[in-house]
Amino acid sequence: MPEISRPAYADLFGPTTGDRIRLADTDLLIEIEEDRSGGPGLAGDEAVFGGGKVIRESMGQARATRADGTPDTVITGVVIVDHWGIVKADVGMRDGRITGIGKAGNPDTMDGVHPDLVIGPETEIIAGNGRILTAGAIDAHVHLICPQIADEALGSGITTLVGGGTGPAEGSKATTVTPGPWHLARMLEAMEEYPLNFGLLGKGNTVSHDAMLSQIRGGALGLKLHEDWGSTPAVIDAALTVADRTGVQIAIHTDTLNEAGFVGDTLAAIGGRGIHAYHTEGAGGGHAPDIMSVVSEPHVLPSSTNPTRPFTVNTAEEHLDMLMVCHHLNPAVPEDLAFAESRIRPSTIGAEDILHDLGAISIISSDAQAMGRVGEVIMRTWQTAHVMKRRRGALPGDGRADNHRVRRYVAKYTINPALAQGLAREIGSVETGKLADLVLWEPAFFGVKPHLVIKGGQIAYAQMGDANASIPTPQPILPRPMFGAIGRAPASNSFNFVAPLAIEDGLPERLSLGKRFVAIESTRGVTKADMRENDARPRVRIDPDSFAVHIDGELVEATPAAELPMAQRYFLF
């Protein structure tokens, strides 16, 4: 039996089972658990494209037609990194969805070809060999302040935005809300040209069930409660009552000043019902100083935002000015300044790092332009994982590689926000049947600059060189919109997520948009136990005077990082 060395195999076909890959310039390593496209025991029939290579007529390419079921596109030999595992496979896409994960090729000449991965003359090929594939990121906390965030999001690997706003109005700059059916309709119209899935949050700060139902019929996939509009116990109870009736999620930013009640009062108003707790973090807002204690609750889905990810020597200083701007505060007013300073606590920011690494905070989002950066969700997630590995060592089950930690952190911006918002039937993971929202990475640039962003099976963004060059690679190489991002393509490759009530009420017919409306699944049964790799519920106690944090009785030492990976090595500015 002829043999091939691992280095030679990796050069030809990419890494295989047992090989390890470093993620960008971090200390994080992944190890391939399984090779479904070749590797040990299966080598010799790998589907690769190029001059003198396999995918040619009557070799790796069959004569089967699209009518016979061949995929529209196959990504060859790519390393999938997802919450369910780290495997190498060929990935097929058809009609904008993932149709197969396994071995692609021509069953007439090759053994073990997956029936849904037969390569025909109508199949396009993307070379994934030596690259990493993840699900498109879901940013579940976005202020829709300016349309340019769409490009920043796509260029970073985000394919779905959930949030609210109407533009640079004070309400939108502070509170992630698109209020009322008129604004909801206008924002849905505005989003037609972007190859992103959108979900809008209506205003839940009211005791009027009629007002909330009007917004859900008008296109809101959920409701947002924000302290700047008054997150009182009565409002919380009313919003959750409507949510239980309609299946939508409630996202809450609780009462920093504890004016209408403390964290215990908020939990009492929630009453064991499911809720997505925005800003379960060290400085983003909510009950001061102990909002993070909600991570121990079984019905609370905790998330935090990226400006505090990870805790560094610059974090606290940066936050004061950001907070004053975002919440329309005046530094000349002592009460406004005291409000801002009460939210910025280094000890709780440091504890946020630990809670993420324990899997106690389940989701990371941006809080885009309202103290967070939409294009840095993915990057800051992996920076946090790197800092935690250096500080805390390997997680249980990790040894030669960090697969457990990597699965935990990738889930925070893919499957878990999808589950929290009722989107997991359609998006959030690399699984057969789901929308082909995928991100292809060069390992050296993982989490920093995507090689390709695939939206609904179509390349929407890519690292691309000079368009007047003779080949695609001459400088300047920049993230640029591709054909999936222009013309009528976004309407075909992307969704507007809305509540079932909006579909039943005829919203798609009333607006007559090109982008498809898709009903969310009910969120009302989703609990902390459903958060993949992030279902821990430690006891958290925060001293009201010193802000010292104890997790399961152990004092947390807030140690800011002075140096990070995925930073100046990759960016000029």
Curated annotation (Swiss-Prot):
Carboxylation allows a single lysine to coordinate two nickel ions. Residues 136-573 form the Urease domain. Substrate binds at H226. Keywords: Cytoplasm, Hydrolase, Metal-binding, Nickel. The active site is at H327. One of its GO terms (biological process) is urea catabolic process. Its EC number is 3.5.1.5. Ni(2+) 1 binds at H141, H143, K224, D367. GO terms for molecular function: nickel cation binding; urease activity. Ni(2+) 2 binds at K224, H253, H279. GO terms for cellular component: cytoplasm. It catalyses: urea + 2 H2O + H(+) = hydrogencarbonate + 2 NH4(+). It is found in: Cytoplasm. InterPro entries: Amidohydro-rel, Metal-dep_hydrolase_composite, Metal_Hydrolase, Urease_alpha_N_dom, Urease_alpha_subunit, Urease_AS, Urease_asu, Urease_asu_c. Binds 2 nickel ions per subunit. Its main location: cytoplasm. Pathway: Nitrogen metabolism; urea degradation; CO(2) and NH(3) from urea (urease route): step 1/1. The modification N6-carboxylysine is found at K224. Its cofactor is Ni cation. HAMAP family: Urease_alpha. Belongs to the metallo-dependent hydrolases superfamily. Urease alpha subunit family. NCBIfam families: PRK13206.1, PRK13207.1, urease_alph. PANTHER family: UREASE (PTHR43440:SF1). May form a heterohexamer of 3 UreC (alpha) and 3 UreAB (gamma/beta) subunits. May also form a heterotrimer of UreA (gamma), UreB (beta) and UreC (alpha) subunits. Three heterotrimers associate to form the active enzyme. This is Urease subunit alpha 2. It comes from Streptomyces avermitilis (strain ATCC 31267 / DSM 46492 / JCM 5070 / NBRC 14893 / NCIMB 12804 / NRRL 8165 / MA-4680).
